[in-house]
Structures are given as C-alpha cells and as structure tokens.
C-alpha cells in the first residue's frame, strides 16, 4: 500500500513539473504555435500572417520568408493565404530525443521596412512509442538462502515519448514468492526491485517464471513486457553491496584524459571466492559512455578516456555492476550521476542575417538597418553574450530577443556632414576571462533634398541711376545648395508682383542659371523711387526646395525736372499774380506767397526763392523768403515808394545743373479802405456777399419752419432708419470717424461732411489718400448743413492715430520745400519720422522762423538732411482748433490746415497732387470753377468761396 502511494505522488509531481515548464515556454516567444508529431503533409499549424499583423497582399511585395538554422524544410508558409503548414514528416524523438522541450524556431523576415519576427513551433508528443525493456528475457539466479524481503533490482523500461506518454506504470504477474516494489528517489526516477515475499525451496521450486508489464500513460495505452526467469541456487547467498546506490559527481568539461572520476567500493558478506568482486560497466551502458569512461575491474576506479564537451552532453549516467566470484556469482549495482561543469571555451559568433543599404538621410529614428544574430555554445554566464557598437555614431543596437539585436537609427543623419559609416559590432560573453568576436558593417547614406538653396544674406540693396539703358545689368544673385547632384542644381526666378499698374517682369528680369538681374527698360525716379522685389532660388530635387532673397533697388534721382509754379488759389492761372497791399502795413507783412514744386527729390527738389532786382530797384520794400517763397515787406511803406511794383521771383532747385522757373507778382499799393483784410485774401466783391448770404439763410430758415410740422414724422422715420442701418463710406453720421487712409503701418481717421479723394498708382511712391477741408462752402440750398458744419464740426477735428508711422514713400518726399498754406503737399522720400521741412504754415515772421540747415551732400539718401528750429516752434493746437498741418499716413502729402472763423472770407486752395494725370485733373477743375464763378456773379448769388 505504501509503495502504491509513493508511486502516485511521484507521478503527480512529475506531471505538475511538466505543466509549469510548458507554461513558462509559452510566454517566452513572440509568436508560438504547436503541432503534433507525425502530422501529415499540409497539416494546418497557424495563420502566421494574420497573427503577425501582416496583410496577405504584402507578403510577396515585402519578400515574406521563413528562415531556420536547422530543420527549415519541416514547415512552410503558403504566401497566398498566410497559413503555416507541415511540409514534411516531424518526428519529435528524432528532433529532440528525451528532452522535455521540443520546439522548432523560425525567423520570419519581411522587408520594406525590414521586420523580423521570432516564431516558435512546439512539437507535441503523441503516444507513438511503446515502453521497451533492455531485453525481452531476463534470467535471475536467486539463492535459496536469501532472506525474506530480499530485493533484486530490475532495469525498468524506457519510453521514447515524453510527459504523460512516457509516464510508465508496472505490473508483475501474480506469484507467491515475489512481488514488485517501485521506489522513487529525489530525482523523480524510479527504481524497480523484485522482492522476495516467501522463502524459496529449490527442491520444491527450481525456477520461477514472471512477466513484467510496463504501461505508459498515453491514449491509447501502449505496453511492453519482459519475461523474468528466476533460477534458485543453493550456495553463495550474499551479493556485493555498494556504500551508496547513487554516486553524484561534478567534473569540468576540460578535464584531461585519465582523470579519476570516482572510486567505487563494494562489499560481499560471503567468504572466499564468493566475496571476490569484479567491477564492470552495466550491460545496458551506451557506446558513448564506453568511449568516454573506463573502469578498473579490480579497484573500481572510473577514469575519463575521451574528451568531454559540455556543449555535446551536459551529464552522464553510468550503471556499474559489482559481481562476486561465487558459484553462481552474485551482483550488486549502483549508478554514477556525472554532471559536467561548463567553462568559457567557446568564442561568440556574430552574423548579419539581413541588411538594408543604403539608408536615406531622412530616415526616421528607429529605422531597422540590419538584424544581427549572436550565439555562444557555452552556457550560463559563459554563454550570455552582449553586443556593443562603435561609439559616437548615430546608430544603436536594440535587443529584440535573446541573442538577437537590431541595428537601428538612433539620431538624425546628415549626408552633408558624414556620407558613410564603418561600424564595428563587438560580441562579448560573460565568462572570466571573457571571449569576444567582431564584425564590420559598412553603411552608406543616400542624399535627399533636405537643404534649400541659401543666399549669403537675406537682403541686398542696389543703387541704379534713373534713365539707365534698357537691358542694363544691375546685380547678380547667387545661392548655394549643400545637397548633391540634381538636388544642388539651382535655378533663379522672379517672384511676380504688381508695381503700380504694371507687372514686375516689365521692369526687371533674372537669368535662370547665372542669377544676373537686368533692368528691361529705363527707370524713372519720379515714377518708381524704390523697386523692391524677391528672387527665388529653387533646386531640382523632388520635391524642389527654394528660398527667397529681397532686392531693394533704389532709383537714384537725376535733376531732370525743373520747378513748376502753382496757382496761388483756385480758379487762377499760374502766371502773373496781382496783390493789393494797404499803405499802412508795417514791416514783415506777408504780401503774397510763391508756390512751386519739383518732381525730383533730395537736392534736386530742394527749392530756394530769390528776387531778381532790376536797375533802380534798390528801394523796393519787399523781400522773399529763401525757402518759404513768402513775399513780405521789409519796412513800413511811405509815399516815396512807387504805387505799383512788378516783382520777379526766381525759383531754383539745387541740382547739378540747377533748373529754374520765374514767377511774376504785381503788387499795387492802395489805401486801407480799398484793400481787403490781409487775413481774408478774397476776390473783389467778396465783402458784399455777406448780406446776400444772410438773406438767403433767412429765407431758408423760414421755409424750413413752415414745413417742419408736415415733415416731423418723415424726419423721425428717416432718423430711425439712419440709426438702424450701418453708416457707409459715402454717408457717415455726424461725429463718426471716417477712415481717411490706411496702410500696412497704420491708419488715420477724420470726421467731415465732405471729402475729396485723390488716387494714385499702386507703386510705393504713390498711394491712395483722402484730403478733407475743415470749413466747407455750401450752396444756397444747403444753408442748414452749412450751419451745422460750422457750429458743430469745424471746431472739432479728429486727431490722427498716434500709432501710424512714416511710409517709405512719405519719407522720400520730405526733402521738397513746397508746402501749401491751406492744403500743402510734399513729395515722399526715404527720410525718417524725425525730419521736418520748413514751411510758411507757421505764419511766423522771418526773424522768428525756424533755422534751416542745408543738406551736407547730394543724392537720393536724404537721411543726412537735418532741420533745426529756433524759438519759433509751432504752438500746440487747442481743443477746438485744427492743427496747422497734418500728415496722412501712407501718402506722400503733408496737409496744413488753419482754422478760421466761420464767416471769414479766406479762400481755401485746392488739393494738388503730383504727376501729369493730377495736373490735368487740376486744370480741368480750375476751368470748371471759373465757369461756375462767372455764373454765380451774374446771378447775384453769394456763396462761400472756400475751396475743398
């Protein structure tokens, strides 16, 4: 009963160990399948493509393949359906022998990108091998003198299968003398013994025939038998016995031949020849053991005979028999369990199984370049291999599985810095001393178009004189590309844009290969002062890369425009001007003002005024401001002065050579009652217009009061509609700001009832601008609006936006001395916001006027022009006053506005723009104004003569 319990516990212990081992193996692989041995050809193993996450359509293009170091023909993959199937007969016992683990390791490799998968196919054991005893008939000589419970060891059966299929149970045929005893040692191995249960009597029973049956645990069960023939002897009833039944020995694998393994010692209780013992190896010892070990039959010493190799066999079990010389002889048995100790005697092996070259320099981090396999036949620490790579390279080794490494990209590549790498992979084991092996990997970096052409600087400034010949070479741009071959082939082109009403390509062109920039036509400084454009450099890569460089072509001014005289007021010609001056005026009284403009800029547009004195003109009591053009008295007038003076004012620019224009001013000295006030400057007959205007206003007020009761509902409805509908550009609500001018640098708003718009081209020197008059003259039918304008809005101008900045066109024109008294204009130039040009708008006497520092050098660059003002700085405008002058941002104009009383008769000059188109519009407007004035005078209707 105890023997049966022990056998059951041993079986369950072995079964539990096998299950735990199998569970550990399942978790150790990346992808694992199982297949029974002896499976037929074509047997389904697993859907390997689906399990690896690969599409069936990718298998052939990505070169799906299965690699194995050994037994590569046992399994195959169908590339049409991605199924792993059995290709040839699989015999587990042939593959793995008695090993508890039996697996076929496969490497699945796919390209584009390179991926490697480790697949482990477990070969499951089937019960295809029956238990086999070493011999079919075993003869045992049993002395009759043996005591009860005497034991005779039996050699158990062996089963080539594993697990449950190799779990054997034994059954002995019934006998009154013997029974079978099965014992399990600490290594879970069973030892069979035939136990004497009843004393033998040779005279009664000379022989005993027994049948020992071994049955495995498979389904169906397989059995093996051995026939035991027991012969009963009379004498020598003691067998040799060993000191221990199992000897455990450890031996280094590099042990030299003839080294003593163990010395056995057996004893026999008999005497004489029956106690003499002869040692020998067991009869069932394999030939391998017989070639590796030898035993001395007398001393019982077991020594090594051949070379031992741990990588070939890790352990040996040697059966030894001790036989006495009795008649019949008796034998004793023991087992030597020899385990070899591994030493570090094998160098690691390194192999590259897949290599993807060359690698693109824009490959993403983590890209697998090569698969490296290392192996070491040693075990334990001696077989633990680590790989290292050449330091300071943009690659690294990543361990994917045991002894498998992937060479991956660790940092970004730059072919322009390093075009090729020579890597050294070193594999080193953990032995002491350690052994290592190296292999070289050459990696070339393929170029991609990752560098755009680069210019030496982002912006170039070019100076070209105006009136250049067509096709003139003005500059050469050059860009460099760090890439190679077609990726570094650079071509140049213009970035097309509009310059005013014309395309940029009508002004300049660039040679696609050389980068030379040509002016296609003569440039005009008065039309284009600054030609700013971009040139693109683009390589021939795919996709192409490009970069831009900005060219600022400054057209240098030449003095090719003479000063042009402007009319003193609307409706008059620009020829001779007549002025009436009272005899009673004192020194410094402004008589008239000569206005002139010059289309040039810089020194060429800097105008000066001087009187041309004839013979006998020494006592002329007039002078002209050098830079203001104001004609004023030098002293008080007396009776000795001529009542009429013809003054010739020479207007001259500062160009080389200087160009001039002459203005004629006729001054008549009259009595105080005959001349208009000096501040009004109205035409003759304007003084009598006030009475007529008052009568008209009275009639208008009476008419409005008469019909107001009938129109009150209409007015309320109209007001409600006006409040509900957003104000448009043409009709702004009173007090609402009106956008005058906007540009990239800011905007300025001003609130008025009427406005004038002057539009110029789109090129930088000319921009859209809008001019407003603070006091507007109204017709006879708009007296109410006139009263509202004068009472509410004239004294409340909108202040300009403080955030605006000077535009390039405004800065360029601030060198002109032209400044209209009411609506003056200066050409823009490249000057800065701190530059101011002296004007007469301050209305200060000559001694108190600002001091002007003339330019220190000629040329288009006027940044050196400095203007210094003395104590006569213009005073700040009050809350209810208009500023003397204001600048419209983004436009080449400085507008001076003086606020006069609403009933004053001061004329307001027309807004004047530069260019031929603007002069033509001005002439047409003046003709139209003259005709209107004549009609008004004939009709005896008086209107305000202020020009907007």
From Swiss-Prot:
A Pfam family: Cadherin
Chain residue ranges for the region called 5 X 4 AA repeats of P-X-X-P: 734-892
Cytoplasmic side: 719-948
Signal peptide: 1-22
Compositional bias per record (Basic and acidic residues), positions renumbered to this chain: 783-795, 907-921
InterPro entries cross-referenced by the UniProt entry: Cadherin-like_dom, Cadherin-like_sf, Cadherin_CBD, Cadherin_CS, Cadherin_N, Protocadherin/Cadherin-CA
A GO molecular-function annotation: calcium ion binding
Annotated PXXP repeat ranges: 734-737, 797-800, 830-833, 871-874, 889-892
Alphabetical UniProt keywords: Calcium, Cell adhesion, Cell membrane, Glycoprotein, Membrane, Repeat, Signal, Transmembrane, Transmembrane helix
Locations listed in the record: Cell membrane
Transmembrane segments: 698-718
PANTHER family per record: CADHERIN-87A, PROTOCADHERIN ALPHA-2
Protein name per Swiss-Prot or TrEMBL: Protocadherin alpha-2
Name of the gene this protein is made from: PCDHA2
């Amino acid at each position: 009963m105890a023997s049966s319990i022990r056998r059951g516990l041993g079986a369950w212990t072995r079964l539990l160990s096998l299950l735990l081992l199998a569970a550990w193996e399942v978790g150790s692989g990346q992808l694992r399948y199982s297949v029974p041995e002896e499976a037929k050809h074509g047997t389904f193993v697993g859907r390997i493509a689906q399990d690896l996450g690969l599409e069936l359509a990718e298998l052939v293009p990505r070169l799906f393949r299965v690699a194995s170091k050994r037994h590569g023909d046992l399994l195959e993959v169908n590339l049409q359906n991605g199924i792993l199937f059995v290709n040839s007969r699989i015999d587990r016992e042939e593959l793995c022998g008695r090993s508890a683990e039996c697996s076929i390791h496969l490497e699945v490799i796919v390209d584009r990108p390179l991926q490697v998968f480790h697949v482990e196919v477990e070969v499951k054991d089937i019960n295809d091998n029956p238990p086999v005893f070493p011999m079919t008939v075993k003869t045992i000589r049993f002395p009759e003198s043996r005591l009860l419970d005497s034991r005779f060891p039996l050699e158990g059966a062996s089963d080539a299968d594993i697990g449950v299929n190799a779990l054997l149970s034994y059954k002995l045929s019934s006998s009154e003398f013997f029974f079978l005893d099965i014992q399990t040692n600490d290594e879970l191995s069973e030892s069979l013994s035939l136990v004497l249960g009843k004393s033998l009597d040779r005279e009664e029973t000379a022989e005993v025939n027994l049948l020992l049956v071994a049955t495995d645990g498979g389904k169906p069960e397989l059995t093996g038998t051995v026939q035991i023939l027991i012969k009963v002897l009379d004498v020598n009833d003691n067998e040799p016995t060993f000191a221990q039944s199992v000897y455990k020995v450890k031996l280094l694998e590099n042990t030299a031949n003839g080294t003593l393994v163990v010395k056995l010692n057996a004893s026999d209780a008999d005497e004489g020849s029956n106690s003499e013992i002869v040692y020998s190896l067991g009869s069932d010892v394999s030939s391998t053991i017989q070639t590796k070990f030898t035993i001395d039959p007398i001393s019982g010493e077991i020594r090594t005979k051949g070379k031992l190799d741990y990588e070939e066999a890790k352990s040996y079990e040697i059966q030894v028999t001790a036989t006495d010389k009795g008649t019949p002889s008796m034998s004793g048995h023991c087992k030597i369990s020899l385990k070899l100790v591994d030493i570090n005697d094998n160098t690691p092996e390194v192999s590259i199984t897949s290599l993807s070259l060359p690698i693109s320099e824009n490959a993403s981090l983590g890209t697998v370049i090569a698969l490296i396999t290392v192996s070491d036949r040693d075990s334990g620490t001696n077989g633990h291999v680590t790989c290292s790579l050449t330091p300071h390279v943009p690659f690294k080794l990543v361990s994917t599985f045991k002894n498998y490494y992937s060479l991956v990209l660790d940092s970004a590549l730059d072919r322009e810095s390093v075009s090729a790498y020579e890597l050294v992979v070193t594999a080193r084991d953990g032995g002491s001393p350690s052994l290592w092996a190296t292999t070289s990997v050459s990696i070339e970096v393929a170029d991609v178009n990752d560098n755009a052409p680069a210019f030496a600087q982002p912006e170039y400034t070019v100076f070209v004189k105006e009136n250049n010949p067509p096709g003139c070479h003005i500059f050469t741009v050059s860009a460099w590309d760090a890439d190679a071959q077609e990726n570094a082939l650079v071509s140049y082109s213009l970035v097309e844009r509009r310059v005013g009403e014309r395309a940029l390509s009508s002004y300049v062109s660039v040679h696609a290969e050389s980068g030379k920039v040509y002016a296609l036509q003569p440039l005009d400084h008065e039309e284009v002062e600054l030609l700013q454009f971009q040139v693109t450099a683009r390589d021939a890569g795919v996709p192409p890369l490009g970069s831009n460089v900005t060219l600022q072509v400054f057209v240098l001014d030449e003095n090719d425009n003479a000063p042009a005289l402007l009319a003193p007021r609307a409706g008059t010609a620009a020829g001779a001007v007549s002025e009436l001056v009272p005899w009673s005026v004192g020194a410094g009284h402004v008589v008239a003002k000569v206005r002139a403009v010059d289309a040039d800029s810089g020194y060429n547009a800097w105008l000066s005024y001087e009187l041309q004195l004839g013979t006998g003109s020494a006592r002329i009591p007039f002078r002209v401001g050098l830079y203001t053009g104001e004609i004023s008295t030098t002293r008080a007038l007396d009776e000795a002065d001529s009542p009429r003076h013809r003054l010739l004012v020479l207007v001259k620019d500062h160009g080389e050579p200087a160009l001039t224009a002459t203005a004629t001013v006729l001054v008549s000295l009259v009595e105080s009652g005959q001349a208009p006030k000096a501040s009004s400057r109205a035409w003759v007959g304007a003084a009598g217009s006030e009475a007529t205007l008052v009568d008209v206003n009275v009639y208008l007020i009476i008419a409005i009061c008469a019909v107001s009761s009938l129109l009150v509902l209409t007015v309320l409805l109209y007001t409600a509609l006006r409040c509900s509908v957003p104000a448009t550009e043409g009709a702004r609500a009173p007090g609402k700001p009106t956008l005058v001018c906007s540009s990239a640098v800011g905007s300025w708003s001003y609130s008025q009832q009427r406005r004038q718009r002057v539009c110029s081209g789109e090129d930088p020197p000319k921009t859209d601008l809008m001019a407003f008059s603070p006091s507007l003259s109204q017709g006879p039918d708009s007296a109410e609006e006139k009263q509202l304008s004068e009472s509410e809005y004239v004294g409340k101008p909108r202040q300009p936006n403080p955030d605006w900045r000077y535009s390039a066109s405004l800065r360029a024109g601030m060198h002109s001395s032209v400044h209209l008294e009411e609506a003056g204009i200066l050409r823009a130039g490249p000057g800065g916001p701190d530059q101011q040009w002296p004007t007469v708008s301050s209305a200060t006497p000559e001694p108190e006027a600002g001091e002007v520092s003339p330019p220190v050098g000629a040329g288009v660059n006027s940044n050196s022009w400095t203007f210094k003002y003395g104590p006569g700085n213009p005073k700040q405008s009050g809350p209810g006053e208009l500023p003397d002058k204001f600048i419209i941002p983004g436009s080449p104009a400085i507008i001076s506005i003086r606020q006069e009383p609403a009933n004053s008769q001061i004329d307001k000059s027309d807004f004047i723009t530069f260019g031929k188109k603007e002069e033509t519009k001005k002439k047409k407007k003046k003709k139209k104004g003259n005709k209107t004035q004549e009609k008004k005078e004939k009709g005896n209707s008086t209107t305000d003569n202020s020009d907007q």
